[in-house]
């Protein structure tokens, strides 16, 4: 999808305020909903994904299962609200051994498990809005001893609210971020930054 585009700085794949936030995504809903609502904390439109079973309600990008993202930027950043319910997301990457690896982070797991094609890890979310920063290059190296080449697919499951999902070439401080990539809270409460842990 983005393989032949010049990639530097920021590359956004979901913005809840955009005219078509799920333009690049496919959605699956069973016993739940995916809809745009106004979040009271930030007084802004967000995408809400809610389901009784995290595995059956999710959004996935790209929408076409035969296509891949082809994003080479190594940092995945998601601005997500903790709904105090089970939540998981998954990223599929390609490494320099030409092997597809999946990283799955969830808030209901307590240990990291590394298997040949999937690494599952715990994720701790603070209350309210969180900025999840995922260093794909570092995770690929630590889990598999190989080098990250590109991201193929991103899948976000229930239960959460999403403001934005983007990739970046490095981690940026709050001051360096373009205004539309920041999360402005009406009462200026700083957004918690959390990292998924893969040990």
Curated annotation (Swiss-Prot):
Coiled-coil positions: none
Superkingdom of the source species: Eukaryota
Gene Ontology CC annotations of this record: axonemal microtubule; catalytic step 2 spliceosome; centriole; ciliary basal body; cilium; motile cilium; nucleolus; nucleus
Protein's GO biological process: cilium assembly; cilium organization; locomotion; mRNA splicing, via spliceosome; positive regulation of cell motility; positive regulation of flagellated sperm motility; protein polyglycylation; regulation of cilium beat frequency involved in ciliary motility
Knockout consequences: Flies are viable and develop until late pupal stages. Display defects in wing posture and inflation, in locomotion and climbing activities and have a reduced lifespan. Males produce immotile sperm and show defects in sperm individualization process within cysts. Display defects of polyglycylation incorporation in sperm axonemal microtubules.
Subcellular location: Nucleus; Nucleus, Nucleolus; Cell projection, Cilium; Cytoplasm, Cytoskeleton, Microtubule organizing center, Centrosome, Centriole
Matching Pfam families: CFA20_dom
Family listed: Belongs to the CFAP20 family.
Descriptive protein name: Cilia- and flagella-associated protein 20
Organism field: Drosophila melanogaster (Fruit fly)
